Amino acid sequence: MCGVIGLYGNTDIFRDLYQGLLAIQHRGQDSAGIITYDGRFHTKKGNGLVQDIFTPESVLRLKGSIGIGHTRYPTIGGGQ
């Protein structure tokens, strides 16, 4: 299972994607990621909870007014 959020706007949308992922995360979550676009794609993903994956440095790299975020919850198998 997973949770997905997508946004399109006129300004950088990282913070809104981040807040959305915080709202849909679950204690069983094992990974998350965000990709944004500003003419180039910018990606950050990792294992763990949303607040552990996205550091203040992530904000500087994930520029763009289009983006998708996801969280993953294992239903079978590992987090690989």
Residue ranges, per PLM feature:
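N-terminal glutamine amidotransferase
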Residues: 1-80
